[in-house]
A protein has these predicted regions:
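Auxiliary Fe-S-binding modules of radical SAM enzymes
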Residues: 7-136, 140, 344-456
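Conserved AdoMet/S-adenosylmethionine-binding subsite of the radical SAM
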Residues: 216, 220-223, 230, 234-376, ...
Length: 456
């Protein structure tokens, strides 16, 4: 029951809900003017405040993290993997949605960062009885699943490297850092992006060098045993040799495994190299713009600001988006650092260029230069993700078409449908996405065969 002592708590929680503000003015305790909150309004407020849908819960978990008590057994579940930039350093969790739009959401929940120790969310349960996440503020429970660690993780390649040091699953996708450490880490003083820990992870928790053969064997095992359809390759800044270095990996995976292949590298000034990349059959290209505000871009990404500049990221993105199938290119940005208005502008700009916005909620990763920065607020991040959906809808960006791709590191555009207002435009866009997915099935089936198979 609401009382004056608990009012501040409920008011703050209500401010994070879409509709609660119209029910309970922020300036008033339980007496509003001369009348009390009705039982109906009180129940509505409690429901709005305590029950989040799966996408809202995903956002709040990204912002607040999760506590794992010592008596909760995690035997057999995927371990915490500090690979690549360090963003996947959390616990892999599957959230059922109860929605026909999307059945489940895969998310990588922060658990080791300092802010997670203060999280109101707590994991409970065990493998045999099932797991759930409890919100200790209101004792609300969300049933979840924890994916098992695949057997191939501990298998060795023919080159003698354990496969989980070549690549790891992030959601249902395989992530592999193919290049040596991003060159920005080699400058004195270092010019690395301040949120990144690639320089600490590559060569420590994952292999420093990954041969084409080792990558192919790992991809083949992940496809055969984990059912993956997509592998994401990235490698940071490697001077002018980034795409040239990546081409043999892309070709080998397409020829010998048959997967959808995505590539994320620093932009290059010779755009003909992107034509060479497209000729290999690469399925997805992404560009990490990170921030739209020039001052924040220079402050947080000194190497990118000095060597590339923001303009090159956008020019390369536009070039690829104009030449690849719609929905094949993405622009990646970080929300929760620069002013939210600039994040909205970045989302609109990326969608206007024909790409889909991939928005990462800022995570102050352990070991990074920003590990002591605060995690962003839920309400602002929810607003950002609603904006993602609306931008994709306005520009008819086809999202979520590829089969069996669930990315756990970010809130994906197709997941944001669970946040969107149910307008006529919403239903038209969702119908468009379903028809597009149906039409794209033969294309994806062909791209998931080896090159030799569909040439024959």
């Amino acid at each position: 029951m609401l009382n004056a002592a608990s009012w501040s708590h409920w008011r703050d929680r209500a401010n994070e809900c879409r509709d609660a503000q119209r029910l309970v003015p922020a300036q008033s305790p339980p007496l509003i003017g001369r009348w009390r909150i009705s039982c109906w309004a009180r129940r509505r407020l409690l429901n709005e405040v305590t029950e989040l849908n799966a996408c809202e819960l995903e956002i709040d978990l990204f912002c607040r993290g999760l506590r794992i008590p010592g008596d909760v057994p995690l035997d057999g579940v995927r371990g915490i993997s500090r690979t690549r930039a360090g963003l996947g350093s959390g616990l892999e969790v599957i959230l059922p949605t109860g929605s026909r739009i999307k059945k489940e959401i895969w998310t990588n929940v922060p658990v080791v960062e300092s802010f997670a120790t203060e999280s109101p969310y707590r994991l409970q349960g065990a493998g045999d009885e099932g797991f759930s996440i409890v919100d200790d503020r209101v004792n609300h429970t969300y049933p979840v699943r924890l994916p098992e660690e695949p057997d191939w993780y501990t298998r060795q390649t023919s080159g003698g490297t354990q496969m989980n040091r070549i690549g790891v699953l992030q959601g249902t996708c395989l992530g592999i850092y193919i290049n040596p450490v991003c060159t920005f880490w080699n400058y004195q003083p270092p010019l690395n992006c301040r949120f990144c820990t690639t320089g600490q992870n590559v060569g420590a928790s994952e292999a420093l060098e990954k041969s084409v053969a080792d990558v192919v064997e790992t991809c083949r095992a992940a496809k055969a045993e984990s059912g993956i359809t997509f592998v994401h390759l990235n490698g940071g800044f490697q001077g002018s040799r980034g795409i040239a270095f990546a081409l043999p990996y892309v070709r080998a995976i397409k020829e010998h495994v048959g997967l959808l292949v995505g590539l994320q590298l620093a932009p290059e000034r010779d755009f003909s190299r992107y034509d060479a990349l497209m000729s290999t059959g690469v399925d997805h290209v992404s560009f990490c713009l990170e921030f739209l505000d020039p001052a924040w871009f220079e402050r947080i990404c000194p190497g990118k600001a000095r060597i590339h500049g923001q303009g090159l990221f956008l020019e390369a993105l536009a070039y690829c988006a104009a030449r690849m199938p719609s929905g094949s290119v993405s622009g990646e940005i970080i929300a929760g650092v620069e002013p939210i208005e600039r994040t909205h502008e970045a989302i609109d700009l990326i969608a206007k260029l024909g790409a889909f916005p991939t928005v990462c909620i800022f995570r102050p990763t352990l070991g990074s230069d920003m590990e002591d920065w605060p995690s962003p607020a839920y309400a602002a991040m929810r607003e950002v993700m609603v904006h993602v959906y609306e931008a994709c809808r306005r520009h008819w960006i086809p999202v979520g078409l590829a089969p069996r791709i669930e990315v756990s590191l970010v809130v994906t555009p197709d997941e944001t449908a669970l946040l969107a207002p149910r307008t006529a435009g919403f239903y038209v866009y969702e119908a468009y996405l379903r028809l597009a997915a149906l039409a794209a099935r033969p294309l994806f089936a062909r791209r998931l065969r080896t090159v030799s198979a569909h040439l024959g």
